[in-house]
Amino acid sequence: MSIVGAAAAVTARGLRKVYRVGVRRPGLWGSIRQLVAGETRDVIAVGGVSFDISQGEFVGYIGPNGAGKSTTVKMLTGILHPTCGQVQVNGLSPARARRQVAQQIGVVFGQRTQLWWDLPTIDSFEILAAMYDVAPADYRRFMDEFTELLGLGEFLDTPVRRLSLGQRMRADIAAALIHAPRVLFLDEPTIGLDVMAKAQVRDFLTRINRDRGVTILLTTHDMRDIEELCERVMVINHGKLMFDGNLESLIASAGLPTTMSLRLSSMAPGLVAGQTLGRTLGQAQGGAQESALCTITAVDYTARTVDLAFDRRKASAP
């Protein structure tokens, strides 16, 4: 869901986070020197990032490990204070108005949980509803709707520690939305999930963005998440914002080839021009769905060469 001209739900200006870490020297003398002198160096996790996210946007925030994605999310949500720069969420500073901002945002970290480990899942929901002062009628409506959309009914009475990764992630997403936030931050919500669990999470996120107008910022290493969910992509590397635009522009700027000629050590029988090569993406109602990655444009069995033409958009997904 993209709203042209909508007010900014999230604003970052010159956002910078610098960590000061100790410098370790080898040997006994190095340890003594570190103990006495306390030598340090600065590590720039995020180095001057600026962007706006409009209300109702679904934005992907991608980059390699250590690029600064999670640090950015933590500053946007008030978990970390920026070294310098400004952050606003719905016009409020997460650092100065923590309670007000907390009422308006939901946060999910794929490798952590806000659920109580030894309690049944339903108890965690009830505790969170009380913490956010959710009215009983709103809570019942939430439970009815989200139990159906996320399939929570099968494990509501199960302790969180006994949930599968897919079940826990669905429960964590529901918990982040229990107080009807206007902005949702998702840090790798599909990490470690199987194909079916990922599809269920993606479908749910699409619905709440489309039907409720929830603004979503998603970090992920799965390009399928970006392709299916996000109209806009931001790329961060070494703490710097390297790209901000749509997926098609990102693929074009990456310089992916559109054609390729291969010389093979041996030729498989049956290769013909016009044949498409692809992969199975999942099981649909009518059978297996397949996404073509490339088309054979020429075959020469004498020279043992095959020419391929790629679909750049589909070839970009893992």
Language-model region placement:
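ABC transporter nucleotide-binding domain
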Residues: R202-G282, G286-D311
